[in-house]
């Protein structure tokens, strides 16, 4: 899990440090970069820091975590854990509460303590010096909180259990007054190296304003630091909606390397939440935007949420082993082939293999010309063939004559590339640039009609043109 007991070691469950170093060397021999997760906002309650911190109120590590007295015979404030219930846990040994934004076994670090910030920067240096190429910084929003521990405001749009995380607007428990300062301090470690990258995990929160604009100053100062574009998780399927969010993100990211992704380990599979054809269109878009295109394992073959029972659930973040709320649905084993355990393992894996692995798997998609996997391969090859698809600037094509069509333009050294995506389920007609040549599409090019600067493309279809 994400309860770190030692920031400088490999959990023995997964091997030894020598195993990781061998993996790192092999990856570098193959010209593959390796990024690892950094979880900077909390540790395990088994971490030596916390064991010392909870031992007494005057321990030197006490201020490494957030400890407070109760208020009116209750918790210090109304903050809620992401897993539900109070964010505070009473510790009888010292008679105070400690803060945990996640599970009670994951106490929050106190980033207002400069010693904690120095420790975290040294941890980053430890892995960078070993040869790790970058860090994905998890749940970064928790590094700064309201110093006065003000109560969070009630969420007027929430009608569920008042103990749920969503019952409040999280206007004081995260992204506090030192958020930008601490982000900048952590990102500054990248400046000490020539070839390291840091990417932050942010989830947009409309109730807290524009997150991307809030960190844009930091990332401009540290172009080796960036943040994921997570807006594709929004199920509002509309061309103008996506257009606005892409434009907003690129303006905020400025000189940094964009990280676009359509799915991850915390969200339902894109093929499950949007359908396979929409997932195909988004994958096409994702691989043709600037910067780094992040593909969550299995999305390249259209993997769907697993079909699990309550007894299958391993994720203790899910309330009462709720299947509906479980993140395990999107974490089932990779489907390599149609064998019993999908080629992932020779024994029963941690989570059950999806029954549809007999049809949706890598081996079958390799030999299917128009498969989602082969579309990914084709686009990745095109990114290597055409520098414009890797390094070209991106702008919005404002006049596609059609509200269902998302139009993007890439430009580099006098060359132009156009990406058009049909967000409707029916064929759409729109104007095309003069002298544009069709390079590829989500589906067979034979399905696309182009004549007299007009093009008709099928529903949920994308097309790449180059002038």
Residue spans for each PLM region:
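Loop/helix patches that line or flank the sugar-binding groove of alpha-linked glycan CAZymes
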Residues: 152-172, 181-183, 187-193, 197, ...
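Acidic/aromatic-lined carbohydrate-recognition and catalytic surfaces
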Residues: 1-125, 129, 141-206, 334, ...
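Short catalytic/ligand-binding loop motif for oxyanion handling, primarily in non-cytosolic enzymes
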Residues: 1, 42-49, 143-146, 206-210, ...
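Beta-strand-rich binding/interaction modules
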Residues: 426-445
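C-terminal beta-strand-rich structural cap/linker in extracellular carbohydrate-active enzymes
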Residues: 449-467
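Glycoside hydrolase catalytic-domain groove-lining segments
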Residues: 237-255
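Hydrophobic residues within beta-strands of alpha/beta enzymes
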Residues: 135-137, 228
């Amino acid at each position: 899990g994400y309860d770190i007991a030692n920031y400088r070691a490999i959990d023995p469950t997964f091997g030894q440090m020598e195993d990781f170093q061998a993996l790192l060397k092999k990856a570098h021999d193959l010209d593959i970069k390796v990024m690892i997760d950094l979880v900077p906002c909390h540790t395990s309650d088994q971490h030596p820091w916390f064991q010392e911190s909870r031992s007494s109120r005057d321990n030197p590590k006490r201020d490494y975590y957030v400890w407070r007295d109760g208020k009116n015979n209750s918790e210090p404030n109304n903050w809620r854990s992401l897993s539900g219930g109070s964010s505070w846990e009473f510790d009888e040994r010292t008679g105070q509460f400690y803060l945990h934004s996640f599970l009670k076994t994951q106490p929050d670090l106190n980033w207002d303590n400069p010693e904690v910030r120095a420790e975290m920067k040294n941890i980053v240096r430890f892995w960078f010096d070993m040869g790790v190429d970058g860090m994905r910084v998890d749940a970064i929003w928790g590094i700064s909180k309201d110093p006065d521990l003000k109560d969070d405001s009630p969420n007027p749009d929430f009608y569920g259990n008042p103990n749920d995380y969503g019952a409040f607007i999280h206007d004081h428990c995260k992204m506090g007054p030192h958020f930008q300062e601490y982000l900048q301090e952590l990102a500054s470690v990248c400046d000490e190296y020539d070839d390291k990258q840091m990417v932050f995990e942010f989830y947009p929160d409309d109730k807290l304003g524009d997150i991307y604009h809030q960190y844009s100053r930091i990332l401009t100062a540290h172009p080796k630091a960036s943040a994921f574009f997570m807006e594709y998780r929004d199920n509002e399927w509309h061309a103008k909606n996506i257009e606005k969010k892409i434009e907003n993100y690129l303006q905020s990211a400025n000189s940094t390397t964009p990280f676009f992704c359509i799915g991850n380990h915390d969200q339902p599979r894109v093929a499950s939440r949007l359908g396979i054809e929409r997932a195909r269109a988004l994958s096409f878009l994702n691989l043709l935007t600037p910067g780094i295109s992040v593909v969550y394992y299995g999305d390249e073959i259209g993997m769907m949420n697993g079909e699990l029972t309550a007894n299958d659930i391993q994720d203790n973040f899910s309330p009462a082993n709720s299947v509906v709320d479980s993140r395990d649905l999107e974490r089932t084993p990779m489907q390599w082939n149609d064998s019993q355990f999908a080629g992932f393992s020779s024994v029963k894996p941690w989570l059950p293999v999806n029954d549809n692995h007999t049809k949706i798997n890598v081996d079958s998609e390799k030999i299917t010309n128009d498969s989602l996997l082969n579309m990914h391969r084709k686009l990745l090859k095109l990114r290597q063939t055409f520098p414009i698809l890797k390094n070209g600037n991106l702008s919005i094509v404002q006049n596609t004559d059609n509200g269902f069509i998302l139009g993007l333009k890439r430009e580099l050294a006098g060359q132009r590339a156009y990406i058009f995506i049909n967000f409707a389920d029916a064929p759409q007609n729109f104007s095309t640039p003069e002298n544009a040549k069709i390079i590829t599409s989500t589906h067979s090019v034979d399905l696309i009609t182009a004549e007299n600067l007009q093009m008709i493309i099928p529903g949920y279809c994308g097309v790449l043109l180059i002038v």
